[in-house]
């Protein structure tokens, strides 16, 4: 007969701890996608698409918040325009959220659907 283990699986506990933290960051991705034409302008919105926000690693809960990097898909011809307007776009995005959510933009040249 098998003895019952004193150990419990940690998967459920880890998920319960991480879900609220991830939800705070994922709202940025969803809000960006929904408001993209307003943030970057109709002309640029047709040639670009926000892909994801990557967040810097934190070594502990006491580390200060650091803004993320917004990865944007951009068609080749529009990349120069986007790069030129990067600082203004970061200001608009951070103004939209009310805090410094984005610190940098990384452009990936690819087809936008």
What residues fall within each predicted segment?
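Contiguous, often N-terminal, cationic amphipathic patches that form binding interfaces
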Residues: 1-113
């Amino acid at each position: 007969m098998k003895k019952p283990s004193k150990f419990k699986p940690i998967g459920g506990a880890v998920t319960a701890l991480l879900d609220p933290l991830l939800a705070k960051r994922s709202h940025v991705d969803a809000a960006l996608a929904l408001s993209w034409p307003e943030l970057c302008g109709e002309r640029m919105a047709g040639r670009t698409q926000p892909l994801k926000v990557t967040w810097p690693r934190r070594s502990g809960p006491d580390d200060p918040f650091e803004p993320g990097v917004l990865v944007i898909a951009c068609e080749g011809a529009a990349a120069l325009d986007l790069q030129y307007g990067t600082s203004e776009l970061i200001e608009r995005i951070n103004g939209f959220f009310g805090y410094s959510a984005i610190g940098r933009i990384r452009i990936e040249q690819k087809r936008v659907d």
